[in-house]
Structure formats: structure tokens, C-alpha cells
A protein has these predicted regions:
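ATP-binding glycine-rich phosphate-binding loop
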Residues: 27-50
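Short, functional N-terminal and low-complexity linear motifs
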Residues: 10-13, 41-45, 106-113
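Short hydrophobic/aromatic-rich motifs at helix boundaries and adjacent loops
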Residues: 13-17, 47-52
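Juxta-kinase regulatory segment immediately upstream of eukaryotic protein kinase catalytic domains
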Residues: 1-32
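ATP-binding pocket architecture of kinase catalytic cores
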Residues: 48-132
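Short N-terminal amphipathic alpha-helix/helix-capping patch enriched in small hydrophobics
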Residues: 16-20, 40-43, 75
Length: 132
């Protein structure tokens, strides 16, 4: 099997897809379809239920810039609190045990990764609205 670090961005996403599927299964969302969303830092997948409801699965990077599980949990708890107050923020989706953050490994992936699932927030990218 080719080393993870030698793979293209798409090749790495293919291997990390198993982590996204596991995170969705553990949240009762296993029937979602997945689409890779290119990003410069984390690996992101957009997930959609047959009824159109959307989610984002964020798989953290590996290495010195990676967030620890406790850092990701603090971020997720903060976003959950903001969402519960009525602010339009990406709301983390807990797993069946109530955890907002998961840590998974997979064959062919160099280390365990921190994974968080968020509800899809409709809108346009801010960059589309910025300009001179």
C-alpha cells in the first residue's frame, strides 16, 4: 500500500472517507451520500440525507498543527452553545453517546484523526462577497 504522505489530495481523501462514514454511522446518519470538499487544511466531506438535510464531516490534519481532541471538544462545545442561543453557526452533531468529537484510525492512514460532524449551514462563501 502506498504511503499516505505520498498520495495526492484526492488519494488521501479516498482513504479518509472511511473515517467520515464511521462518524456518520455513529450519529445515525449512515444513509448519507458523501462528496469531498477541497480545503487547504482539514479534509472535509459534505454529507446529504435523502431528504436533503446536509452535514459537513471535518477530519483534522495530522502533525504539529493538528488540534487535539480536547481543543476540538472545546470548539464544538462553544459552537453548540452559540447554536442553542439562536446564532447561525455550524452546529456540531453528537454521536449516540452524546460526544461531539470522535477520534478514529483507518488502514493506510498514518495516525488517528480528530473528527467532528456539523450541520450544514446554507449560504454563500464569504469570499464570494468580498472584493475591491
Amino acid at each position: 500500500m502506498k504511503e499516505f504522505s505520498a498520495l495526492t489530495r484526492l488519494g488521501r481523501a479516498r482513504r479518509l472517507r472511511a473515517l467520515a462514514c464511521r462518524a456518520l454511522e455513529e450519529r445515525g446518519l449512515g444513509q448519507c451520500s458523501l462528496a469531498f470538499l477541497p480545503d487547504d487544511t482539514n479534509t472535509l466531506f459534505r454529507a446529504r440525507l435523502p431528504n436533503g438535510e446536509g452535514f459537513v464531516v471535518r477530519i483534522g490534519v495530522h502533525g504539529p498543527t493538528a488540534h487535539s481532541p480536547s481543543e476540538a471538544a472545546a470548539e464544538a462545545a462553544w459552537l453548540a452553545a452559540l447554536a442553542s442561543s439562536g446564532l447561525a453557526v455550524p452546529e456540531p452533531v453528537p454521536d449516540r453517546e452524546g460526544r461531539l468529537v470522535s477520534v478514529y484510525g483507518a488502514p493506510g492512514v498514518e495516525s488517528e484523526r480528530v473528527v467532528v460532524v456539523f450541520r450544514w449551514l446554507p449560504g454563500r462563501p464569504l469570499a464570494d462577497r468580498l472584493g475591491p
